[in-house]
Each structure stands twice: as structure tokens, then as C-alpha cells.
């Protein structure tokens, strides 16, 4: 790293179209600043941040249809997904367990399988990029500890058939984990069946630092029953608290406080307005790209995927646009809260300049 790079200012968001993180809500910024030195990993020593974590988990439970949630504010969706697999493995009867997930599942499940020493079985998706239910059913067996469904896939913004996956999981006495890390803050305002209220979901990932407008790091790990956290707990003899179910020891009090502040400021009306605006932006961009002849995947949630030649993609990156590709090389644009209609119009102007 050169000295110039070390002095580089923080990332501006005026051309960021690929990230699932966004600018935090002002109230979340202020709250995070006040709790920079606190550690929710030691709740007896830091009771104020521990209280805020309990309140944040309660509000997340309200969002996902769980009246008595158990969980904590994690570093992000990767940690929450790993913890879901870890809890299921620890509660399973089998010695060598497997995890069944759709091929569209986040790459964090590959990390979880590697770290935890479990087998990851990936089922293909159907023609609309959702989990193929029949393929999932073919992959589960008596050693399956957890079946994974995604509520808002990273690449195409699709929602897997969660109730059907729940039936498959129940048939082999496995947990059902829903990864709603990105989609969890928009799905309450849709007709999708995805939450704890819609199916016998055991665990869920939902990230306030994505569509929740909380500062990074602020993920969420939620469980239906306390036994899930018991399966994760280890003794912590030198702390004021006796046990700890979290993956990290020292954790971000700023993330906890910021998450609670954004939840209090925006749930439900602010998040409803945000969903309507971001979904409208996604539909606008999809329609404009389709009108220009690109093959576009219909945006079910605020994410647009479209076929785009590599030369055009690279030229747009050279213009400063932070864009990414799916595994099948489609252009991927995430319409996060910081993405405005004016930003998308400027992006389209640069697309037109390539013609």
C-alpha cells in the first residue's frame, strides 16, 4: 500500500450499485458513536449495551414474525449462517451431518462447512433462480442437520419456497434455516411466505447493516427456541457472565446501539417507504435496460440482473461505477436506500454513451 492509498478518504456512495451495505441512518450513526468502547460480549460488565441488544432482538423478532425471539446482534450474515449450521450440528444425533442448500445460497455456507467439518450438498435452482424443491428432497437424508432456504438471494433477489422447504426439513427431523440477511427488511411489505410466522423456521439471518440502515457491523442471528442458543453456549470463567453463545467474544457495542437506533427510527413506516422507493427504482432500471435490448430478470425485490457484454461492463467500471456480476456473468445492480433515481439515470446515460 502506498502512502497515497493510506490517505484515501472513505468510500462515497454516489456510484455504488453493487453493495448490499448502505449509508447508515443519522440516528444510528449517533448511537454507534456513543457506544464505541462497549462490548456486548460481556453483558454483565456492559449492561447498557446488553439491554440495547435485547431490545434490538425483540424488534427483529417483530419484523420476522417471532413473538419471543432468541438471538443476538452478530457481525453479519456470514456469522449468522455459520451459527445456524453449528447449532444444528451440535443438536443432531448423527456423527457426520450434512447441510442441504440451494446453489443460490450465499458463499458463507461453504465457509461454514469448511470450518465446522460438515458436508454441504447443493441443490440446483429452477428456471426462476429459486431452490428446486424436488432436488432438495432428493438430497436430504437421516444425517441432514439443516435445510437452508434463502429469502432474498444475493445474485437475483429471489425468495425460495420456504414452506415447502420446511416440509422437507421436518420429514427428516432437520432444522430449517432461512437466510434473510438482505431480504428481511423488505419482505414484510410483500406477499411472500418467508418468516417464522409463515413456516416452522428454526433459525434466521437478518442484517440491520444491509436494508436496515444500521452501521457495519450489525447482523442478526435469530432462533425460535432457547435450546438453539444453549447448543452454542460455552463457559466463560473469567467474565462476569457464565456462558456465551456467540461466535465472537469481544463484539461491537457500536453495531448493537446503531442497529437498535435504526430499528426504532424506521420500523415499520420508514422501512415500508424505503421498500416502495427501492422497489420502484429497481423496476425503473429493469424497464429501461429492457427497452435498450438487454435481457433482464424481473426484479422480485430491489435487485436487477441483466445480461451485458463484458466490454460494456468493464467500460462502465472504468467510468467509476461499482457494479458486479452474478456467477453466470449477468450485470447485478442492488437498489439500496442510497441509490436514487438520479443515480440510475446517470448510469443509464453512461450505458447509452457506449452505444
From Swiss-Prot:
**What is catalyzed by this enzyme?**
L-aspartate + H(+) = beta-alanine + CO2
Per the record, residues carrying N6-(pyridoxal phosphate)lysine are 210
Origin: domain of life: Archaea
**GO terms of biological process kind:** carboxylic acid metabolic process; coenzyme A biosynthetic process
- One Pfam annotation reads Pyridoxal_deC
Q: What is its EC number?
A: 4.1.1.11
Which prosthetic group or cofactor does it need? Answer: pyridoxal 5'-phosphate
Kindly tell me the pathway this chain contributes to. Cofactor biosynthesis; coenzyme A biosynthesis
The kind of enzyme this is, by top-level EC class, is lyase
Query: Which key words are in the record?
Result: Decarboxylase, Lyase, Pyridoxal phosphate
SUPFAM superfamilies on file = PLP-dependent transferases
- What does this gene product do? Catalyzes the decarboxylation of L-aspartate to produce beta-alanine.
The name this protein carries in UniProt is Probable L-aspartate decarboxylase
The source organism is Halobacterium salinarum (strain ATCC 700922 / JCM 11081 / NRC-1)
Amino acid at each position: 500500500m502506498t502512502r497515497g492509498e493510506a490517505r484515501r478518504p472513505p468510500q462515497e456512495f454516489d456510484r455504488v450499485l453493487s453493495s448490499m451495505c448502505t449509508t447508515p441512518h443519522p440516528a444510528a450513526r449517533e448511537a454507534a458513536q456513543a457506544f464505541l468502547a462497549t462490548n456486548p460480549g460481556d453483558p454483565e460488565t456492559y449492561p447498557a449495551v446488553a439491554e440495547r441488544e435485547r431490545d434490538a432482538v425483540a424488534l427483529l423478532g417483530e419484523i420476522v414474525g417471532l413473538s419471543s425471539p432468541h438471538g443476538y446482534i452478530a457481525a453479519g450474515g456470514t456469522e449468522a449462517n455459520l451459527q445456524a449450521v453449528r447449532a444444528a450440528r451440535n443438536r443432531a444425533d448423527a456423527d457426520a451431518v450434512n447441510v442441504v442448500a440451494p446453489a443460490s445460497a450465499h458463499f458463507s455456507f461453504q465457509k461454514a462447512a469448511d470450518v465446522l467439518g460438515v458436508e454441504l450438498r447443493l441443490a440446483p435452482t429452477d428456471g426462476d433462480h429459486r431452490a428446486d424443491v424436488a432436488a432438495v428432497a432428493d438430497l436430504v437424508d437421516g444425517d441432514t442437520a439443516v435445510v437452508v432456504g434463502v429469502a432474498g438471494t444475493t445474485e437475483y433477489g429471489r425468495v425460495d419456497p420456504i414452506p415447502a422447504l420446511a416440509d422437507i426439513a421436518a420429514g427428516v427431523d432437520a432444522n430449517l434455516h432461512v437466510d434473510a440477511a438482505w431480504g428481511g427488511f423488505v419482505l414484510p411489505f410483500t406477499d411472500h411466505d418467508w418468516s417464522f410466522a409463515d413456516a416452522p423456521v428454526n433459525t434466521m439471518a437478518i442484517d440491520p447493516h444491509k436494508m436496515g440502515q444500521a452501521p457495519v457491523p450489525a447482523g442478526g442471528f435469530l432462533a425460535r427456541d432457547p435450546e438453539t442458543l444453549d447448543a452454542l453456549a460455552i463457559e466463560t470463567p473469567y467474565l462476569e457472565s457464565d456462558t456465551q453463545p456467540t461466535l465472537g467474544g469481544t463484539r461491537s457495542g457500536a453495531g448493537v446501539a446503531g442497529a437498535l437506533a435504526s430499528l426504532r427510527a424506521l420500523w415499520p413506516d420508514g422501512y415500508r417507504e424505503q421498500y416502495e422507493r427501492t422497489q420502484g427504482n429497481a423496476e425503473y432500471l429493469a424497464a429501461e435496460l429492457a427497452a435498450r435490448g438487454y435481457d433482464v430478470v424481473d426484479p422480485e425485490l430491489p435487485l436487477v440482473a441483466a445480461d451485458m457484454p463484458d466490454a460494456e461492463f468493464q467500460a462502465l467500471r472504468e467510468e467509476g461505477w461499482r457494479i458486479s456480476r452474478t456467477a453466470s456473468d449477468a450485470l447485478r445492480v442492488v437498489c439500496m436506500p442510497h441509490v436514487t433515481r438520479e443515480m440510475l439515470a446517470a448510469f443509464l446515460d453512461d450505458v447509452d454513451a457506449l452505444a
